Amino acid sequence: MTEPAVISTDQLICDLEQLIGMAGSTGQTDELRTVAARIAAMMRNRGLKVDVRPTPGAPIVIGWRGGRQPFTLLLYHHYDTPSPGPWRAWLHDPFQLAERDGMVYGRGVADGKGPLAAHLNAIAALIDAEGELPCGVVVVAEGDYLTGSPYLGPLLADRRALFRADACLASGGDRDASGLPLCYSGVKGLVQIMLRSQEAQTALPAGMAASVPNPLWRLIWALNQIKTDQEEILIGGFYDAIEGPTTEENRVLRTVLADEAGRRSAWQVDQFLFGLTGAPLVRSEVTLPTCNINMLHTEPVSDPPVIPRSAVARLDFQLVPRQRPQAVVDALQAHLAAKGLSDILIERLPGGYPPAQSPIDDPFVRLVSDVGRYIHGQPLTILPRGPFTMPLFYFAEAFGIPVASIGVARPSSAIFGANECIPLPDLVRHGQHLIEVLYACSATTLSA
C-alpha cells in the first residue's frame, strides 16, 4: 500500500462553504457563470492551468496539470444543481453549508459540488505532499449536466486537445447494501422529448367537450400508446438493438445487493416495481432502458373547468448500449403516426447522448475497483452501469478510452429534495480514493 497524501478536512469544509454558498440551479445562467468563475479560481489555486470556455448556457471549466508519468486521467464533474424547492422544507438554508452530527448539508453537497471539491482537494494534497502529481489530470466541470449536457460535445469537437486523456473517471452512482460505493464500467445515455397536442387557438368552455377535441385527452391517449401499466415500452423497435448482459456481467449481477432498506426508509416507499428485491432489482436497474414522464401541463392553466388550448408532456429515456438518442426519437415519431396520432408534435430537447460502456474487466476499471481496498478495506464491486446517466460517451468516443464512475451519495442524501446531505467522511474517502487511483495509474502501462 502506498502512503497517500492526506486531504485536509478543514480545507475541504472551507471549499464546500464557498461552493454551496453560491446558488447555481439549472437554467440560472448568470449565477452559474459566477460559480464557474469560483471553480476556475479554486483550480488555479491548486496549481492547475485553467481554461473557462463560454457556451450559450453555463461555462465549461477545464483545468489540467501534467505529472511524473505521461498517463492522463480525465475527471468529469458538474456544478449545476437542482432547484432547492420550497425553502421551508429545509432545516437549514440550502445555500449555506451546515454541519450536524458528522453530516454536511446544502444543495449540491452530495452530488456535483461536493464530489468536485473532494477531487480538487485530493489534487491539492498530492501537490502539497510531493510537489507534483503522479500522473496528469484533466478536470472538466460543466454547468448544464442536468439539462442533458448540450454544449459539451460541440466544445470537445472544437477543442479536442484540451480534453485529451487516457481514461475517464466520474463521480456518481449508488452504494451497496453495506454502504460501500459501487464502481461502474459504464453509464446510460439520455434523450429528452417534448410532446405537444394543440387544437383550438384559445381555451374553450368545458361544455364544448361534446363537439370540440380536447388536446389533453389526445395527449393522454398518445402517452398510453408509448408505455403499458406493466412498464413495457411499446415503441416499435425500441428494444431491438439491445444485447443482454455478458456471462461475467450476469455473474456479478447475481451477487450485488442494493441498499433497499435505506431506500425505503429515505424515500418512504413500501416496495419497488413489481415487488422486485435482491438481485432481480439490481439487474432491472442495470440492464433496462427507461421511459419516464417528468412533466405534464396544459396551456393555459385554469382553475375553472375549460378545454385547454394545448397540452404538453416531457419524457426522458435512459438508454443502454447500442441504443441511440435520435433513433429513439425517429421510432417514436413513426410509432405515433402508425397509431393515428401523427398530429402529436414531437420535439427532441437540446442535449442528450448515447451510453458509454467499458468491459467490466477493463484494466482501468479494475484498477479503480482494486484501490478501494486502501480506502474501504476491500475492492469495490463493479457493475456495468447503474440507474443514472452521464455524458461520458463524448470522451470514450473521441479518444477510445475506458470510463468508470464511483458512487458517492446515499439513499438519504436527497440530491433532488430538501435537506441534501452526506457524511463528511464519505467526501474525504472519495477524495482519498482519487489519490490512490492517481498513484496506481502512474505505476501502470494503461496508456496507449
Feature annotation, model-predicted:
Residues 2-109, 128-135, 315:
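Acidic/His- and Gly-rich active-site-bordering loop/insert found
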Residues 79-81, 103, 140-149, 171-176, ...:
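Acidic, glycine-rich active-site loops and adjacent beta-strand->loop/helix elements
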Residues 80, 226, 230, 333-342:
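A common structural junction motif
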Residues 104, 112-186, 446-448:
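Acidic/histidine-rich catalytic neighborhood of metal-dependent amide-processing enzymes
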Residues 110, 201-203, 317-325:
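A generic structural motif
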Residues 154, 209-231:
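A short core secondary-structure module
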Residues 177-178, 234-310, 318-331, 339, ...:
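An extended, acidic, His-containing surface patch that forms the Zn2+-binding/catalytic region
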Residues 183-198, 404-406:
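Flexible glycine/proline-rich, aromatic-decorated loop/lid segments
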